[in-house]
């Protein structure tokens, strides 16, 4: 019998994951919030439960899932890249709270959905215990979608979360016509901020230099296909945040993530200047040009590479 997969979330990424599982011969069912409440029948005989929901919907849906008592053999796969505003919780944190006895893995990497749907090659990381990640690799991995495993679930998840903010910065850079040199500096120094916060959150340094960290950062910060990049680009063109979001198809998680990360960094005295400037632009307290000026006026300092 082919593996049965239930995907929660009917957005672009959820649809792309459904396509990938179907390509591997899995039997796939999909559910979206517009379809009403979940039912126990959806969980019958499934092997993988994949969450591709926006972060703001995860807690509500996870609460529904746990009330239906899904069988313990189901592996939960979190494919959400965001932080909950009130709690600093990641999507995996939320699923762990509501389904503590299920195996839980995180799927993340440089995966622009539209390229994958065209059949173009890509790679990603499954973070979690190796027995569970192996099952996901077997169900989802293919010659055009290469899956690696990593036991550092926290690091895999944090890389995918943080890169969205830096992608907004790079969209602003390109929208202002500031060139490749400046964008390269933003990506590199953004990686430093990712490692600084991600390791404080419990991730391992090495993970952030892999596919789910640096890899995702490069893809998202250099492609107009990225929703977060698009938001930054529209802001640089003089659009308001509401206008930028209206022009961007789908959820740009980096908008909320920037604010949450700034609050977290302030509480824990972590220096994340690029993220802070992105948040200031999103809040409307600085123009993109003024934010850039603030970054360039920072005192000179030694280049510190986390992990060295």
Swiss-Prot record:
Q: Which InterPro entries match?
A: 6-PGluconate_DH-like_C_sf, 6PGD_dom2, G3P_DH_NAD-dep, G3P_DH_NAD-dep_C, G3P_DH_NAD-dep_N, NAD(P)-bd_dom_sf
PROSITE patterns reported for this sequence: NAD_G3PDH
Q: Which cellular components does GO assign to this protein? A: cytosol
Tell me the protein's name: Glycerol-3-phosphate dehydrogenase [NAD(P)+]
Record-listed NADPH binding positions:
13, 33, 81, 113, 227, 253
Chief place where the protein resides = cytoplasm
Listed as disulfide-bonded, the cysteine pairs are none
Listed EC numbers: 1.1.1.94
Residues bound to sn-glycerol 3-phosphate are 81, 109, 163, 216, 226-228
Catalytic-site annotation from UniProt: 163
